[in-house]
Amino acid sequence: PKGVAGTYQFHIKAAGAQGSWLYLNTETDYRDRRSITVSIQPNVVAELQSKYGQPADTFFIDKKIEVTGEAKRVTIDFMSRGRATNKYYYQTHIAVSSIKQLRVIKS
């Protein structure tokens, strides 16, 4: 399916990293089909840490954010011994490639 471009507001409940990428999640279990994942490129992660003065993976927990981008369903493969299995699930991701796409909303 096509993605839906827009500006979205979310409460972040969890965060995780894979390599230098950061993932902010709207549910504590990122596999929950209701969860929206904001995937942040490594260069933006570094900028966010510099801007907020603390690691981005902890800073955003329990904060409300506004993110601009395309919400898109992506297929996530289950892996075994470094190889994709024939099992998978879906997540909704919004990719962030610029710090301008993301801001904390003051409540």
Where are these regions (language model features)?
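OB-fold single-stranded nucleic acid-binding module
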Residues: P1-S107
